[in-house]
């Protein structure tokens, strides 16, 4: 997700708004039809698809213009995306070949005649088209290393057209809903300004944490801790150094490692083996849960 994800290291607010504005302008210039969402699920039978969990990432099969393609669920990505060879194979119409995605990168924009996920079909869905080989679990790997090549990613541009998303790791399924099905349980997954968040508690502290899944690293949760929460956390240990890959390259950060933190999502609880409290300012810390792999089932 290093090219398409929204987070401070990737896109600032001005760039993100510029992308949205540019996309709308492209629609008008190209006179593109609006996306139509068709839900063929029957009452009591929601649109559920099988899911594979590989190295902490969620994969499903989606239909692109009638072709089934293994797809990465990338809720950190601004747009649903496919690689150039798949776009050529499907005959995707390219209507913009230089959309700025970050200060140093450009992508093509195309339109899919149809995108099917379970019983839901989206007609005339806009997608990004990226160069072949750009999306891979390890960009340094060679072609014969057996590394997973990612040809398609399901992003926020598609998910925001739906009303609910349920990830059930225990049964290996993802359910997509347009609002046709009656909702059960308490929703704790939401989009705010196209950024995905989860509601949860950490050691009893209510938190709305940014939930990111993507191709560059295992899914993770991140959110803010303030000084007033210090009494609810274990004593901070020594400062350690960490690094992560961003669009600009490797970025280092300082953090305190905490163990034994209880995370509660809905009625489910799990003890997290490690929470990294990253120093931001004198009175604020960012809590990150590295490698969170959806072990709490039924995240809605």
Residue ranges with predicted function:
Residues 1-300:
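Pepsin/retropepsin-fold aspartyl endopeptidases
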């Amino acid at each position: 997700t290093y090219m398409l994800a929204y987070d401070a290291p990737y896109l600032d607010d001005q760039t993100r708004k510029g992308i949205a504005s540019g996309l709308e302008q492209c629609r008008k210039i190209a006179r593109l039809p609006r996306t139509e969402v068709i839900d063929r699920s029957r009452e009591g039978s929601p649109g559920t698809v099988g899911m594979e969990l590989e190295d902490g990432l969620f994969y499903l099969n989606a239909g692109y213009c009638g072709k089934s393609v293994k797809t990465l669920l990338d809720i950190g990505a601004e747009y649903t995306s496919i690689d150039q060879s798949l776009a050529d194979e499907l005959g995707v119409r390219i209507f913009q070949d230089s959309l700025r995605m970050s200060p140093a990168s450009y992508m093509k924009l195309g339109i899919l005649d149809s995108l099917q996920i379970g019983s839901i079909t989206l007609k005339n869905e806009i997608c990004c088209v990226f160069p072949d080989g750009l999306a891979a679990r390890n960009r340094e790997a060679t072609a014969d290393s057996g590394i997973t090549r990612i040809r398609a990613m399901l992003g926020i541009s598609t998910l925001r057209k739906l009303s609910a998303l349920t990830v059930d790791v225990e049964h290996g399924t993802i359910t997509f809903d347009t609002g046709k099905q009656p909702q059960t349980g308490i929703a704790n997954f939401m989009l705010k300004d196209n950024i995905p968040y989860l509601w949860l508690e950490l050691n009893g502290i209510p938190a709305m944490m940014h939930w990111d899944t993507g191709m560059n690293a295992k899914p993770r949760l991140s959110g803010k801790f303030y000084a007033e929460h210090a009494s609810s956390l274990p004593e901070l240990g020594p400062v350690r150094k960490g690094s992560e890959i961003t669009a600009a390259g490797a970025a280092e950060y300082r953090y305190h490692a905490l163990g034994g933190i209880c995370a509660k999502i809905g009625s489910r609880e799990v003890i997290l083996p490690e929470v990294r409290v990253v120093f931001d300012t004198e009175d604020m810390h960012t809590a990150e849960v590295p490698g969170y792999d959806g072990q709490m089932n039924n995240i809605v």
